[in-house]
């Protein structure tokens, strides 16, 4: 009787671990993590048109390649 109980417990553990491995675990959304992404320089961002060059008009620091906005993009 004890052997049967142990066998049933082992079978239950194996089935539960198999269900977790197949994807029955957590269902939370995974964030995209870019570990190997290359960070671009300000010049590369400007060249590709992703940001505004210095002395051009701006409304927020995110628009400027240097992230310094005072009505126009500044170098410092």
From Swiss-Prot:
Cysteine-cysteine disulfides: 51-65, 58-69, 64-73
Prosegment location in residue numbers: 20-37
An example Gene Ontology CC term for this record: extracellular region
Record-linked InterPro entries: Conotoxin (IPR004214)
UniProt main location, coarse: secreted
Entries under Pfam families matching the protein: Conotoxin
Domain of life, per lineage: Eukaryota
Subcellular location: Secreted
Stretch forming the signal peptide: 1-19
GO MF, one annotated term: ion channel inhibitor activity
Record keywords: Cleavage on pair of basic residues, Disulfide bond, Knottin, Neurotoxin, Secreted, Signal, Toxin
Free-text tissue specificity from the UniProt record: Expressed by the venom duct.
Domain statement: The presence of a 'disulfide through disulfide knot' structurally defines this protein as a knottin. The cysteine framework is VI/VII (C-C-CC-C-C).
Protein family: Belongs to the conotoxin O2 superfamily.
Stated name of the protein: Conotoxin VnMEKL-021
């Amino acid at each position: 009787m004890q052997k049967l109980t142990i066998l049933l417990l082992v079978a239950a553990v194996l089935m539960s671990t198999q269900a977790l491995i197949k994807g029955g675990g957590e269902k939370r959304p995974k964030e995209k993590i870019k570990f190997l992404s290359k960070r671009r320089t300000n010049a590369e961002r400007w060249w590709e048109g992703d940001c505004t060059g210095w002395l051009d008009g701006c409304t927020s620091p995110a628009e400027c390649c240097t992230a310094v906005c005072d009505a126009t993009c500044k170098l410092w």
